[in-house]
Amino acid sequence: MGNTVAREDFEWVYTDQPHADRRKEILAKHPEIKALMKPDYNLIWVVMLMVAAQLTAFYLVRDLDWKWVVFWAYVFGSCISHSMTLAIHEISHNSAFGNGRAMWNRWFGIFANLPLGLPYSISFKRYHMDHHRYLGGDGIDVDIPTNFEGWFFCTRFRKFIWIVLQPFFYAIRPLCINPKPITRLEIINLLAQLFFDIVIYYLWGAKSIFYMLAGSVLGLGLHPISGHFIAEHYMFLKGHETYSYYGPLNLLTFNVGYHNEHHDFPNIPGKSLPLVKKIAAEYYDNLPQYNSWIKVLYDFVMDDTISPYSRMKRQLKGEVKQD
């Protein structure tokens, strides 16, 4: 478990990200894909059901023994929580109400955030738009690990710990790489979350709060669904920046595994990304792809050529516009 990864820096590239050019090519050849660029109103009802499911779980765990609270936090709560972060990802792209009602999406994102326990939705939206516009951009794309992460988490054991601690690095990384002024909506997100947490504690006590927070932390750390964090952009094959996953966990994650398709068409809801792949199969079928996020996690830890440094980075040119 002590083998050290030889890579000592990111993979610096001097070309633009591939998604804009591929999008133009696909739309020229398959203009019918434009019909998929519309809201997914079913997302609204799915999110409401997920919030209701977590509220029910908060009530049911309130008097359980602690061992069962921990058990259900990992077995059930972690899945719902991670799935909810990906619903928030969909909402950040205005998939719930459409681009014409952008603020409705922001308020709905704050609502979807409530059963996670920690404010997330508004800040995520701001940084995630940068990730799409400036994929791999040095000092802008906070999906890229810090130099410390690449340098320190360089053995199998340390990479395993890095996976466990993923939620903490995703929370801290923006402050290190690209800090932004706090906005009014972020303050509202924080206050709404604090109020919700206080109400849950008042109604059902510490075990419900623990279940909520533990489910979020565990679901974003050492968990099968968390394989998507690594599968999406870590360079397992030299020269390939984005990878899709076509396995069954897409059913729980709003098709976030269709990641090449998503970056090519970020304004198409996850529900319709399989149709994008079907229509433009000649563009996607031969790209590197995964069928198991668990295997991605295993390979990341055990492959001594892969580390947090295994990301493509680029120096941005021209004016950079951020949210």
UniProtKB/Swiss-Prot annotation:
Has sphingolipid-delta-4-desaturase activity. Converts D-erythro-sphinganine to D-erythro-sphingosine (E-sphing-4-enine). Catalyzes the equilibrium isomerization of retinols. Coiled coil: none annotated. GO terms for molecular function: cis-trans isomerase activity; retinol isomerase activity; sphingolipid delta-4 desaturase activity. GO terms for cellular component: endoplasmic reticulum membrane. Interacts with RLBP1; the interaction increases synthesis of chromophore-precursors by DEGS1. The keyword Amino-acid biosynthesis does not apply. Its EC number is 1.14.19.17, 5.2.1.-. Keywords: Endoplasmic reticulum, Fatty acid biosynthesis, Fatty acid metabolism, Isomerase, Lipid biosynthesis, Lipid metabolism, Membrane, Oxidoreductase, Transmembrane, Transmembrane helix. It is found in: Endoplasmic reticulum membrane. A motif (Histidine box-2) lies at residues 128-132. Expressed in retina and retinal pigment epithelium by Mueller cells (at protein level). Belongs to the fatty acid desaturase type 1 family. DEGS subfamily. The keyword Lipid biosynthesis applies. Its main location: endoplasmic reticulum. The chain crosses the membrane at residues 41-61, 68-88, 102-122, 159-179, 185-205, 209-229. PANTHER family: SPHINGOLIPID DELTA 4 DESATURASE/C-4 HYDROXYLASE PROTEIN DES2, SPHINGOLIPID DELTA(4)-DESATURASE DES1. It holds the Pfam family FA_desaturase. It is a multi-pass membrane protein. A motif (Histidine box-1) lies at residues 89-93. A motif (Histidine box-3) lies at residues 259-263. This is Sphingolipid delta(4)-desaturase DES1. It catalyses: an N-acylsphinganine + 2 Fe(II)-[cytochrome b5] + O2 + 2 H(+) = an N-acylsphing-4-enine + 2 Fe(III)-[cytochrome b5] + 2 H2O; all-trans-retinol = 11-cis-retinol; all-trans-retinol = 9-cis-retinol; all-trans-retinol = 13-cis-retinol.
